[in-house]
Amino acid sequence: MYLTDEELPFGIDDIVFLLNLEIRHKNAVSWDCDCPFCGKKGKLNVNLQKGVYRCNRCGEAGGKIGLYASVYHLDNGTACEQIKEYLGKNSQAPAYQVYKKEIESKKEVVNARRAPDLVLHQTYSELLTMLTLSETHKKKLLERGFSEEEIRKNGYKSTPVFGFRSLTERLIKAGCTVEGVPGFYQEEDGTWSLRFKRSCAGFLIPVRSIEGFIVGMQIRLDRPFDHTKYIWLSSVNDNMGAGSGSPVHFVGNPEDEIVFMTEGPLKGDLSHFLSGRSFACVPGVNQYANLPDVILKLKRSGVKLIYETYDMDKLLNTACQADYDEACVSCEFRKEKGKHQCLKKIEKRKHIQGGCKKLYGICRELLVACKQFVWDLDAEGMWAGNLKGVDDWLYDLKGKTPDQADEDR
């Protein structure tokens, strides 16, 4: 009678010990170890809760017995007996030869030159007319604070789940150019298609330039992964595809004397709707490659002052309170709250402040005034921990209580 993985008297962490795998990164759920199959450092993800492993480079995967058995080329029964023997002696298993598994080299991808903004706008605008917004996504946008009219005006649409080729064919027949438009690519048979994945389902957020052209698309994922909620519609890894270019989103009047700078187009759209103010939105606080050109355009159109309104993590209290993320479970300081500084919080605050400093530096070089904008402060002038984004603060000013389901904003 064979035991199931759950009934075995050892865990996958014991196998990691026996094989003497070097752990490069760990948290309460999983470890990233050196792969014994291809030798790549830190690519073998070992899930402690599920008792499984997978190499993100060579693709080797399986359960805890399979990990040991595959390394020593044994059947599962023999592997199980050896595992129990070595664990009983509290000793590691014999040395083994790391098999340098060859990874099939991919063909070099040839990208198309990114199309001009006007072409992007025409193609994306036509694409949006062919798509719909699901009731689920509409409800989420309403819960965030948008009105139905604003949702319609901004052009949010749900990602399609099939018919990518036919959508592309319809666009081409409508006179649209797809070559050089991020998201579109050419398949091996020469047919053009659209790069949507089921694992990246969500709703599309049009990203607009100062001139009002749709120059990119972000996707708000239904199921975020690796702490990622937003991704670009891109085909940079596909034949004749194109990268997003990470453009800066603008909403409002570029001739306003005051413009607010924040992170994320959806946050900017909502903040503009709630306040009536103009917002420029970088894709991420440290994604500033396109920022100088945007600020220069704003300066030429009459902008006198830019307010930095990045998230209030920039004033995050870094004292350890065992409340930050799953890493707190394994932190040695968790039982001594308030006595130590949280390294994770320090890293997060440093990341946000780095983006702030870069914005200040660009504005200084271009001779545009820039000031920090803050809210939700405690008595010590640090973030009180309630209203993280400028959209949260503006929503709160409206006298509404955000729905619990809106914690993912």
What are these regions (language model features)?
Residues 1-104, 160-163, 168:
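N-terminal structured subdomain of primase-like DNA metabolism proteins
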Residues 1-10, 54-59, 256-259, 267-409:
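TOPRIM fold recognition
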Residues 16, 69, 84, 142-143, ...:
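Residue-level preference for well-ordered alpha-helical positions
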Residues 24-25, 144-158, 276-287, 373:
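Short, well-structured beta-strand/strand-turn elements
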Residues 35, 55, 68, 141, ...:
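Terminal peptide-recognition signature
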Residues 78-136, 140:
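Conserved active-site segments centered on acidic
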Residues 131-176:
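Tandem CBS (Cystathionine beta-synthase) repeat/Bateman regulatory domains
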Residues 164-302, 318-320:
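Phosphate-handling DNA/RNA-contact segment within nucleic-acid enzymes
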